[in-house]
Amino acid sequence: MKILYLLFAFLFLAFLSEPGNAYKRCHKKGGHCFPKTVICLPPSSDFGKMDCRWRWKCCKKGSVNNAISI
C-alpha cells in the first residue's frame, strides 16, 4: 500500500511541475502552440511539435490570423 502512495505522489509532482516550463522553446522562437489541425500560413511559420503538448504544434505568432482549421 505504501508503494501506491509513493507512486501517486511521484506522478502528482511530475505533472504539477510541468506548466511552469511549458512551451518555453516554442515561445523563444516567437511562436505559440496550436492543435495539429490548424494549418500555419505561410508553411515556413510552422515550427513543428517543438515542446508543445501531444497533438499540438508550434506556429509563428503572426501566422495565427492566417491559420486555417481543418
Curated annotation (Swiss-Prot):
Gene3D superfamilies: Anthopleurin-A. Its main location: secreted. One of its GO terms (biological process) is envenomation resulting in occlusion of the pore of voltage-gated potassium channel in another organism. Keywords: Antimicrobial, Disulfide bond, Ion channel impairing toxin, Myotoxin, Neurotoxin, Potassium channel impairing toxin, Secreted, Signal, Toxin, Voltage-gated potassium channel impairing toxin. Transmembrane segments: none annotated. GO terms for molecular function: potassium channel regulator activity; toxin activity. Residues 1-22 form the signal peptide. Disulfide bonds join C26-C58, C33-C52, C40-C59. InterPro entries: Myo_ane_neurotoxin_sf (IPR023355), Myotoxin (IPR000881). This myotoxin is the most abundant transcript in the venom of the specimen analyzed in PubMed:23025625. Monomer. Belongs to the crotamine-myotoxin family. Cationic peptide that possesses multiple functions. It acts as a cell-penetrating peptide (CPP), and as a potent voltage-gated potassium channel (Kv) inhibitor. It exhibits antimicrobial activities, hind limb paralysis, and severe muscle necrosis by a non-enzymatic mechanism. This is Myotoxin. It comes from Crotalus adamanteus.
